[in-house]
């Protein structure tokens, strides 16, 4: 029987940032410390959601909840700020899942990038 040890030191991170990237096809949740070093990164596909089910609010809720519980157990996180980007359907569900994990949420910020009349959009699809 072989036992493998994680070579990365367990750090006690009390304050962190939850990055939620919600697209039309998937949701990606990354939890970092305040300097931006990644602690946990996961997506809806990692929890068994496939195809169009990855973009549902339920998948976003499960993904965010699992990621936050993992980082609380491993690093003892108590306070987070939330940054949400993307136009996906699971934005609010993921925020609610983070708030339900008994963490102190200091701020919720929308970092979705919007063009100020930049590049021309591609034409409509003709089938």
Curated annotation (Swiss-Prot):
Q: Name one GO cellular component term.
A: ribonucleoprotein complex
Q: Which SUPFAM superfamilies match?
A: Translational machinery components
What GO molecular function annotations does the UniProt record carry, in alphabetical order? rRNA binding; structural constituent of ribosome
- The UniProt record lists the keyword RNA-binding: yes
What keywords sit in the KW lines? Ribonucleoprotein, Ribosomal protein, RNA-binding, rRNA-binding
Q: Single Gene Ontology BP term?
A: translation
What does the UniProt record say this protein does?
Answer: Located on the platform of the 30S subunit, it bridges several disparate RNA helices of the 16S rRNA. Forms part of the Shine-Dalgarno cleft in the 70S ribosome.
Alphabetical list of PANTHER family matching this protein: 40S RIBOSOMAL PROTEIN S14/30S RIBOSOMAL PROTEIN S11
The UniProt subunit note reads as follows: Part of the 30S ribosomal subunit. Interacts with proteins S7 and S18. Binds to IF-3.
Q: Which family does it belong to?
A: Belongs to the universal ribosomal protein uS11 family.
Q: Which HAMAP family match?
A: Ribosomal_uS11
What's the name of the protein? Small ribosomal subunit protein uS11
- The gene from which this protein is expressed is rpsK
């Amino acid at each position: 029987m072989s036992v493998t040890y994680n070579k990365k030191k367990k750090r006690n991170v009390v304050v962190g940032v939850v990055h939620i990237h919600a697209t039309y096809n998937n949701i990606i949740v990354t939890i970092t410390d305040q300097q931006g070093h990644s602690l946990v990164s996961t997506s809806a596909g990692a929890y068994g959601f496939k195809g169009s089910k990855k973009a549902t609010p339920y998948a976003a809720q499960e993904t965010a909840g699992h990621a936050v519980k993992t980082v609380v157990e491993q690093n003892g996180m108590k306070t987070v700020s939330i940054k949400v980007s993307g136009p996906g359907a699971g934005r609010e569900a993921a925020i609610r899942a983070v708030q339900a994990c008994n963490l102190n949420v200091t701020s919720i910020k929308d970092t979705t990038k919007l063009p100020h009349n930049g590049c021309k959009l591609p034409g409509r699809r003709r089938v």
